Amino acid sequence: MKTSRIAGLVIILVVFVSLAAIWFYPSVQAFMANNTMWNGINKFSKEFNVQNVDSISALPTTPGQDVLIAVPYEQYSPTELIQMKQFIENGGKLIMMDDFGYGNSFLEYAGIPARFDNTPLLDPLFNYKNENFPRIMDFTANITGSGIKGVVFNHGTALRDVAQSQALAWSSNMSFLDTNQNGNWDQDESKGPFVVAASYNLGKGTLDLVSDSSPIINAVAGNNDNKLFVNYLINSNGTPDKVLFDRSHVTKSPLDASKIQLANARRVLSNPYTLVGIITLVFVIITWYVYRRGLLIGGS
């Protein structure tokens, strides 16, 4: 066997093994659907049959009853702000779950007065395990009527400038915003109750705000009534046609970026027209190779 042929086979084997490793190696990055560890959203994605969106421009222009979940860890571009607002105004629902404040740029653009405070919300009395896991137990009548008694946050924040008519849930009066982040309440720090969830009508659609993104991660989704609360938000306007998750604004590792590219390639290759094209190309290459071999053998 020629050296070039051996080298070619080795290259093919290396590529195949690399692609298999990328495909099957589990993700450990937060908010990744194939991450089964504590910070992934594997359970949430399966429960609500979530479809990932890797670009805001890919959002449907006529969303109908579609629901988009956004966990912004990066700033939105001006074009993305326009597209997100159009998604809501055309009838879609956006549930923005944020504790870092990156979602405030959209709130400002959309003319919504509320803001994510971006200061840690602690509760030394009403909590799960410790003050960093505030237990939310004060809700509107509709939410309470749906059987929700308590929701657990994980290093969340609060919402500012929310009118009473827009509020959905509040922290306890023992909660406080830990401005200096020393873990204790100080005289100059604000005490609760604070609004932690709110809802706004925008055009034909709805914008819901939750000041913590952790209720959908694997480790927290099963605590108290977190799953019921997320289910209430998703279905409050009726059963959605699709539940979408904005994957374009969460932090991705090189492995996750490669997984996404590989999944996109697989999706393209699974298209019937693409398969016909590939089969035709392979047939032409094999025919040409056999023909060339025949000429070489005949010439010798």
Where are these regions (language model features)?
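Short, surface-exposed patches at the edges or C-terminal ends of soluble domains, predominantly
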Residues: 1-300
